[in-house]
């Protein structure tokens, strides 16, 4: 008798995606990050659902409702900090996942890669709107500054900003709609994840060597399920340590002050995972130029498949490209540090240099190095 998981219409889909899926035997632990992202999304949706039961999206009560969750709701503090720090873990996994895609040439599956970029924008939008909900000082001023960037769009900018705000400033209408979208978007993200996997399973996973692996496959279960469970346990351990020992490590102390439109914080900055893009935005003195650079810092990922000039798919056997890749990682860490610093000398010039380096490495140096490595193969 055939196993039910291979015959049942619904179980068959799950079986082909999670049990009997053939995976290249050389796939390393770097490929764990996709599974970890699914776990992060599940944690965020569950904790967010329970937080939404106690949260009120009204400017008069939002800050107090978050305080009430932490003080009076059973394990409310755990829910709140799991959700806040879970977002940080989400972005750590997300950036590792993108980095691994760049390193191993996964962007050659352009449909999967492009859906991934849409997912990145959706997750960033969700995280931004979530940061506004506690209605602290940084929530209010962050929302004001970031939404105000849209006013740089010619002709329609100002009207667009007021349409998003639902008035002439960030107020009750803004908070209510941000809460509605923050609740809705994770489910849209979950649907996009299914599409992402659908496109991935059309082609099958690539592998670190970059050569066809059809003759050398292993079933997903038990080999990769065990590996992924280990990764999830490691991530949950890290998240638990963060939540239980230093829950405010990655937050901003200004967000414990209720939002006050009459008092501007000395240094407005977003959450740490947006600081690299914020640094690129600030490095250009022109408003429209800064906004374009901000958007392009993410959209540049979409042109990476077009700039692939190497005869090899992955960077595994390309040491010069590897050096450039790690230089890009170091550059992003520098930008993240600069984004959290005040706008003064020497941070301004460091930020500008790091921003130029970011685009130069991706758009110029990587394709040029790949072409040089092609010539080296002839020696």
UniProtKB/Swiss-Prot annotation:
A Pfam family recorded for this sequence: Cytochrom_B_C
Entry binding sites for heme b b566: 97, 196
Xref: Gene3D superfamilies: Cytochrome Bc1 Complex, Chain C
CDD domains the UniProt entry points to: cytochrome_b_C (cd00290), Cytochrome_b_N (cd00284)
Chain residues that bind a ubiquinone: 201
Listed GO CC annotations: mitochondrial inner membrane; respiratory chain complex III
Descriptive protein name: Cytochrome b
Species per Swiss-Prot/TrEMBL record: Pteronotus rubiginosus (Mustached bat)
